[in-house]
Design a protein with these regions (language model features):
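N-terminal catalytic cores of NTP/NDP-binding nucleotidyl/phosphoryl-transfer enzymes
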Residues: 1-2, 108-109, 113, 174-205, ...
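Residue patterns forming the tRNA-binding/recognition surfaces of aminoacyl-tRNA synthetases
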Residues: 1-106, 111, 194-293, 421-454, ...
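Flexible, glycine/threonine-enriched loop-and-boundary segments that flank and lead into catalytic domains
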Residues: 78-83, 87-105, 150-173, 305-327, ...
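Long, charged, mostly alpha-helical binding arms that flank functional sites
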Residues: 88-93, 99, 221-224, 228-268, ...
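Catalytic alpha/beta core of large soluble enzyme barrels
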Residues: 126-222
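Active-site-adjacent "gating/activation" loops or surface patches in catalytic cores
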Residues: 173-183, 325-363
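Gly/Pro-rich turn-and-neighbor structural signature
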Residues: 267-320, 331
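Conserved small/polar residues in nucleotide/adenosyl-binding loops
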Residues: 550-557
């Protein structure tokens, strides 16, 4: 699959700033950095520049975003998380000339604040920064000291703002005024890897400017009330001031007047997915790399089986070595559903069985995968469609994100001593009681607080249920008296059938389905036990109550 994606142009090898886990000694995707720490080791992540393989998920950013509106069977929370992660922004690009003849390009969603720019900030890996490192030891030391933290936008925005002032200056694209140039630890290597600092109207820039005594120039005011920028930035749109020919215009109108100084642009927060990992247990990357030129590569699909199994090969006096890196763990899980559907195929990646079974009707997974597996799977599905391997462009029609079983208000963990052993519970109460309580205690999408008292209650109810279904007398034909008495139960039974069917098939609300069954059982007064019912009605009753209690049904038929 990777080789096919490579041939399609969806795989690139690039030098990029990555999240490096110093304990696991491997690269982590932004999605795998939690609060600045590695998702497996818990170690503080540092920024590092390496040569790695990446999948061009950015090419699908627009479709990944727009098609979320059509995923009606997905929880809105998951769809919104993906919208935020993809992060589409409309704005403008501006170019700043510099005293060193370099050109610094920036993207901004607030072009109306262009006259409030008082500094430019470059990322640690900006081309100008890299060039200056070679001759500036202080800058090099500063970068080494400030390379900790994730490469994600959220982590950078929360980090302590630190900067290094460069001797070079930039020139404002409209006024030609001199502007300071800084290297900032909060600037990401996304887009151009540079930003225009407008401290009066951006809180991150404001904090940075306050710390380093950089000028704060207000260029937008609220038309209805006085703005005080002595304590914080004014980030809302309003009326333009202190901006020459833009004065008096509304923010939107001012942006439209700047077309001759910049160009409209669309930007996405979503970055290409770096998939190279430095783990010995991962799936191998099927590529050979030129020993003297890392950009000269050969996919295994271009080699015979003998050559691809060698650690080193010689082609036209060029030495190629097998890539020592392995795939990110999410690569295989991003398309396994398609391969499992065509597991009998030995000569093709996927066969017609994949089209027969996909998309998956009902997918179940934790919400923690919203911007990981669930997003990557959507990308892979679209790519496989473009490769003519699949007919569908979306992998999962319906998605259920199940909650977590908690004990004492927290996730079960051996270190916390709050682990519940299901085998012991099944041995004492039976699998039906454990299953019933798990489904009844909370909606499937919410976390469940485990309670042995609740489990005991489920056990008692099942005993009552068992006895009740076998106490009811059966008869082929009812007399008039029995029919009249039974009519009330018949109405309640039909209502319950309708409710439980809807809860299971459409709403996926298992707890309310079980609650309906409980209401039905509690509804049956003693007089019904003295009344004969038809075998058909008793069968319906038994079927509906054994939907959630499968082993009760098994006992009946054994």
């Amino acid at each position: 699959m990777f080789c096919e994606l490579y041939k399609r142009g969806l795989v690139i090898r690039e030098e990029a700033e990555v999240n490096w886990d110093p304990v696991d000694k491997t690269v982590l995707a932004n999605e795998q950095v939690i609060d600045g720490k590695g998702w497996r080791s818990g170690a503080e992540v540092v920024k590092k520049t390496i040569n790695q393989w990446a999948l061009k998920i950015e090419d699908y950013a627009e479709e990944l975003l727009s098609e979320l509106d059509n995923l009606h069977g997905w929880p809105e929370q998951v769809r919104q998380m993906q919208r935020n992660w993809i992060g589409k922004s409309e704005g403008m690009e501006f170019s700043f000339e510099t005293s060193t003849s370099d050109l610094i390009k920036v993207f901004t969603t607030r072009p109306d604040t262009i006259m409030g720019v008082t500094f430019l900030a470059l990322s640690i890996n900006h081309p100008i920064t890299k060039k200056l490192i070679k001759t500036n030891k202080k800058l090099e030391d500063w970068i080494l000291e400030n390379s900790k933290g994730s490469t994600s936008e959220i982590s950078s925005s929360l980090a302590d703002k630190r900067g290094f002032k460069l001797e070079a200056t930039a020139f404002h694209p409209i006024t030609n005024e001199k502007i300071e140039i800084w290297v900032g630890n909060y600037v990401l290597q996304y887009g151009f890897g540079a930003l225009m600092g407008v401290p009066a109207h951006d809180q991150r820039d404001y904090d940075f400017a306050k710390k380093y005594n950089i000028e704060i120039k207000q260029v937008v005011e609220d038309p209805d009330e006085k703005v005080d920028i002595s304590k914080e930035a004014f980030i809302k749109k309003g009326v333009i001031i202190n901006s020459d020919f833009l004065n008096g215009l509304a923010s939107e109108e001012a942006s439209n007047q700047l077309k001759q100084y910049g160009s409209k642009s669309t930007n996405f927060r979503l970055r290409n997915w770096g998939v190279s990992r430095q783990r010995s247990w991962g799936a191998p990357i099927p590529m050979m790399i030129n020993k003297n030129n890392p950009n000269d590569v050969l996919p295994f699909s271009d080699l015979n089986e003998i050559s691809s199994n060698k650690e080193e090969i010689n082609i036209d006096d060029k030495i190629y070595i097998k890539d020592k890196d392995t795939f990110d763990t999410f690569v295989e899980s991003s398309w396994y559903f398609a391969r499992f559907a065509s597991y009998k195929s030995h000569d093709k990646i996927l066969d017609d069985e994949a089209d027969y079974w996909l998309p998956v009707d009902q997918y179940i997974g934790g919400i923690e995968h919203a911007i990981l597996h669930l997003l990557y799977s959507r990308f892979f599905c679209k790519a496989m469609n473009d490769l003519n391997l699949l007919e569908t462009r979306e992998p999962f029609t319906n998605l259920l994100c199940q909650g977590m079983v908690l004990k004492d208000g927290s996730k079960m963990s051996k270190s916390k001593g709050n682990v519940i052993n299901p085998k012991e519970l099944i041995k004492e109460f039976g699998s039906d009681a454990v299953r019933m309580f798990s489904m009844f205690a909370a909606p499937p999408s919410q976390s469940l607080e485990w309670s042995n008292d609740g489990l005991k209650g489920s056990f008692k109810f099942l005993n009552k249920l068992w006895n009740l279904t076998f106490l009811i007398k059966e008869q082929e034909i009812l007399d008039a008296k029995d029919e009249e008495i039974f009519e009330e139960l018949n109405v309640k039974l039909n209502q319950t059938v309708k409710k439980v069917t809807d809860d299971f098939e459409r709403r996926q609300s298992f707890n309310t389905a079980i609650s309906s069954v409980m209401e039905l059982i509690n509804f049956i007064p003693e007089k019904f036990l003295e009344t004969k019912v038809t075998k058909e009605k008793n069968k319906i009753l038994r079927n509906i109550i054994t939907v959630s209690y499968t082993h009760l049904r098994a006992h009946e038929t054994s």
